[in-house]
Amino acid sequence: MIYKTRDLGEREMPDSKVIIFKQPIFGFDDYKRYTLIFDEEIGDQIVWLQSLEEPGLCFLLFNPSQFEDFYKPKITEENEKLLGTGEYACWSVLSLKEDFETSTVNLKSPVIINSTTGVAAQVILEQDYPVRHPIMEGAK
């Protein structure tokens, strides 16, 4: 399948790389089909979450594993039922600023992807995490 992206032109992607949101990105309820785009130049800490239904819709996601000293999201039973059994990948929506060091990530509402099935959801954690956490604070 060939799809258009907001920032990276046209890309080819196998159907196995389609991510289906059972609980959509907040504010974007009409868009449920996405794919992750990795860029070798920037590593695996930041990826694009590109809509397959709207080429202009794309989010930057950040791997919050660098906050492992204090960020330990717990997935509720309800979310486990929604996502199904499998291995989960947790990503935080990145709000990129001109000065990267002032960028923030949403730790309260991560995007959780079942890596086995491709089912995803943006969830609100019951834990007390900030919606705008400075990306450089607590980074390893």
Feature-to-residue mapping (PLM):
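Short beta-strand-centered segments at strand-helix junctions
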Residues: 71-78
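Conserved, well-structured core segments that form or line functional sites
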Residues: 82
